[in-house]
Amino acid sequence: MLVETKARVGVFAIALGAYLPQFPTLVPEFEGQYAAFKKTVPDTVEVIDGGIVTTKEQSMAAGDKFRTADVDLVILQLLTYATSYNMLPAVRDLDVPIVLVNVQKKKAPDYANTDTPTWLGELYACGAVGEMVADLERAGKRHAVITGVVEGGDPGVQAEIEDWCRAAQVRRRFRDTNLAQIGRPYPGMMDLYIDETNLYNRMWLYTKQFDWEKMWAIADNVTDEEAIRAKAQDILDTFDIEGGGTIEKVWDMARYVVAFEQWVKDEKIAFVASHYDGFAKGVAGKLDSMLIPAFSMLIKQGTACAVEGDIKVSMAMSILKTIAGCGQLSEMYSIDFNEDICIIGHSGSGDADISKAKRPTMKIVPVFHGKTGGGYLTQFYPPVGDVTYLAITQDKDGHFKFVVAEGVNEPGPIFTFGDTNMRTRFSCGAREFCNRWSEAGPTHHMAAATGRHIDTILKVAKIFNVPVDIITR
């Protein structure tokens, strides 16, 4: 990615302090279990280690570390029974979910030969889970529980831990980067309009405003011909260009991409929402004609670029790019009633990482429908198979909401006029999907990613404390 971010995850373990002097063998036992547990947290995140907590004071010290680090998530290992005061001081001042990991060391007791310290050390992790959740509820904290076993390995537990860490990456990306708004939303698309201060207060995403005059001049000082040539080759490697492509043909486009990449790094931009509604002449027309593929090159590198000035869909694209590896802007295009299929897609910039069925294509059109000017269009080709859609919307009080659905992309004819589009079948049928999706009140744009990702999106939603409407899965 052009702007790298890394989630910070607070990790600690708790046990009842009264057990340790009674059964001293529990000390090395718990130390070994905690050391092994920390290794299950993927190295894609930064671990903030709160240690093994057996007293209120140790819990407060862990909480100080978590608060100072501004953790995106807390993962708590329950080693044995513990009272909730071992936990609450560590999380009291945090506004992130606490994931309680209840992993038992042994698959089953050796009933006849189990003594008290063996039971407490290897078989009693589940004893305090309900108590912890009860007090997290009373403290107004979000929470989740993962139950499993150490002996023999437990892929389900490992997958859940990794999924939570993947979701935590979204929060860190929102907090550590910026959103660039260039111009303003498409006139009259009021579902796209947004209060940027409310966005920051609720989602921790800061908006930087940029004028098109700056964008027109952004490449004026790019003179490194080696960098431009390398980027031109990157463009040719990414797209099949109608009529053939050469480095000379995409030279100006490559120069702008080099400039945009540096701008993204300098401004720490992970989201772009842009729309131009002026005269497509001169330098304005030049950039406007090549902006779609130029921004597609940014999307490929992790910066979500949305057309029509849609900030909310740029957020959805970034979420899916972060958790699923691709994020394609889409909207409801058409319904094939004969086949009970929804045609979903959009014109404009797209994500090469979703184009698994075919290499993306680029062609020149005389007019961008509904917009100023004409120029290059890019079309991407999502594969057949599972697909997830995510839209972000708001209620009348400004609270955000996720709207999600899973379906299956099927083979068959698609539109060929230059827009990305796919044929998606939903379990509820095309008519009912359109009704349910629309009734949820999303913006008319959504993001798409290959695979099924609702479970991870639910974790992201819990981290941001926003509700989710699941349309179908």
Language-model region placement:
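Cap/lid and interdomain-hinge subdomains that line or gate substrate/regulatory clefts
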Residues: 2, 6-9, 107-232, 236-239
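Short, acidic/small-residue loops that bind anionic groups at enzyme active sites
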Residues: 89-115, 120-128, 293-308
